[in-house]
Amino acid sequence: AASMAACGARANVAVVSGGSVPKLYMNARDHVKKDVKALENCIGSFALLITPDDGQTPVIRLDSLGKHTVGAGAAPQAITSALTFEPLQKAGLKMTDVDKYAPELHNAEITLPAGAGNVPEANYKMIAALSVMKGQIERADIPKFVAERGMPGFVPTQGHIPSGVPYIGHALEALKAGTIKRAMIIGKGSLFLGRLTNLADGASFIMEGPGAGTEPAQGVSQSDVTEMLLAALSDVAANLQKG
């Protein structure tokens, strides 16, 4: 969607997604066993409007998109590296240059009683551990990294709704207000794909404030071109005389 808007193929692109009815009360059996109320009683959905860069709205960087390729492997460390470290490295950024990471933002109140753990916290710890491996933070700074660059999970467990996408609205407000400079939105994992192929899918992108990471174009005047041509011709003439 962002690529179509950026290249001018489409002026406005709407990205709309809804939850899955069959996944209502998906973990209810475990909740009931533990005498916990079945909380999965809502369907999550979201919609985004992608437009060309107007210089005033936060942007999606298209030069550093993350993707989980088949060759990356299915190990959690490999997936995390493909979706965070590699695209940041491509953009010349460090893991600490991202103010907020938004991975799978499952609501822990639902997943903990179901035995799935605190999914967002596990993701943040993995990202922090990868930062330690790359020498970008110290091991003792892992809790601080998680606290400052993470967030509690708040999203219904509805298919791919609990990715990082629901944070986009909050990120837009924070980027406009200047409270953060950069956020990374991460989506990964597919239960059905994983069951069928033992592989996972994933993608990520970086959001930045208006004008961030861009430099004004340097205009070249006619006189500049003339001077460069004259200098080049002088060099050619000098070489011919030497010959």
Task: Describe each region flagged by the PLM.
Residues 21-31, 165-168:
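Active-site-adjacent elements of ketosynthase-type condensing enzymes
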